[in-house]
Amino acid sequence: MKLLLLALPMLVLLPQVIPAYSGEKKCWNRSGHCRKQCKDGEAVKDTCKNLRACCVPSNEDHRQVPTTSPTPLSDSTPGSIDDILTVRFTTDYFEVSSKKDMVEESEAGWGTQTSLPDVHHSS
């Protein structure tokens, strides 16, 4: 049991001490490593995640090969005519007025010439 308790911290600290065990990510077409700082004889070619630099050995000419090729369009035949659709937007609007506005208009002479009937309230 004591041996297990001693081995566990060693396995946890081992990746931080030995770079080969740290699981550094490969970058730049698998020819470089993501590190905080590049070693002597390495050049920074790109940036990796977590603000790390992609360190590539500087004595070789490394060119990154694109991993994907352009995808051709399925309907890209020469001479095809594209349909153009024009949509015109129309706005429908309504005027809202109250009875008070109608009374004021009729008094000003702009509305109809009929007067409103008198209303008598009985109690």
Swiss-Prot record:
Functional note: Host defense peptide that exhibits antimicrobial activity against both Gram-negative bacteria, such as E.coli and S.typhimurium, and Gram-positive bacteria, such as S.aureus and B.subtilis. Inhibits cell adhesion of E.coli on intestinal epithelial enterocytes. Causes rapid permeabilization of both the outer and inner membrane of E.coli, leading to morphological alterations on the bacterial surface. Binds to bacterial lipopolysaccharides (LPS) with high affinity, and may thereby be involved in immunoregulation through LPS neutralization.
Pfam families assigned to the protein according to its UniProt record, in alphabetical order: Defensin_beta_2 (PF13841)
Family per record: Belongs to the beta-defensin family.
Signal sequence bounds: 1-19
Subcellular location: Secreted
Chain intervals with Low complexity compositional bias: 66-79
Post-translational modification as stated in the protein's UniProt record: The three-dimensional structure formed by the three intramolecular disulfide bridges is indispensable for antimicrobial activity.
Region described as Disordered: spans on this chain: 59-79, 102-123
GO CC annotation terms, alphabetical: extracellular region
InterPro entries documented for this protein: Beta-defensin, Beta_defensin_dom
An individual GO BP term: innate immune response
Protein name (record): Defensin beta 118
Main localization category: secreted
Superkingdom as given in the UniProt entry: Eukaryota
Lineage: Eukaryota, Metazoa, Chordata, Craniata, Vertebrata
Example GO molecular function: lipopolysaccharide binding
Keywords of this entry: Antibiotic, Antimicrobial, Cleavage on pair of basic residues, Defensin, Disulfide bond, Secreted, Signal
Residue ranges annotated as propeptide in the record: 64-123
Cystines in this chain: C27-C54, C34-C48, C38-C55
